[in-house]
Amino acid sequence: MSAERSFSKEVGLLRLGEGEEFHGEGILAVTKALLQSGVAYVGGYQGAPVSHLLDVLLDAEELMNEMGVHVETGANEAAAAAMLGASINYPLRGAVGWKSIVGTNVAADALSNLASPGVVGGALIISGEDYGEGASIIQERTLSMAMKSSMWLVDPRPNLSSIVDTVENAFELSEVSNTPIIMQLRIRACHVQGRFIAKNNKRPLINTRARQKDPAPFEYAKLAHPPVTF
């Protein structure tokens, strides 16, 4: 699959280590934050303004293979959301991205079945919000979908330090609360240019190069149906 836009030069920034200064675009900083957080798998369905998240991942194929990070493009938002099911029973940090409320609506079924049993590994949904000036005609927001499924929604300020901190903190919040997190990224946040001090990338303990030998133990309480839900 070819990228919509090439980040072949910029992906070198994803290798920056502790104390080095990152200078680049917002969506590239999100990818760096995912790697710094020890993400094990990333997926999504392309849609503005977060289409370039997958473009960055595809151009960074060599680094993703080195880190053991699984990257997958979904046939739609529902397929992308279903990927996060890996974090229900396994201590894997995963992230997926798609377009705003319309994409979240397509993923509603999968998200309900993700939020009800909860997650043990951090699960992050990156929602590209495009309401307001210079955006699409759709003015609805993803907050209502987050409320429907009792999921946290975080909204970073449009500067790289805030965005990176939000990604890292979102994974921690997801794990301690056993709840998927939605992070909304508006147009300005996706394309803003800025800088932040980088950290070392973290290789996930379970990855494509170090697979878990045995399946996770079956936990009946995580099945979202009676009598567990009584």
Q: Residues of each region from the PLM?
A:
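Short beta-strand segments at enzyme active-site cores
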Residues: 43-44, 94-97, 181-185
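Metallocofactor- and cofactor-centric catalytic cores in central/energy metabolism, strongly enriched
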Residues: 2-82, 105-112, 169, 195, ...
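Flexible, low-complexity linker and terminal segments
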Residues: 1-27, 157-230
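Thiamine diphosphate
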Residues: 48-175
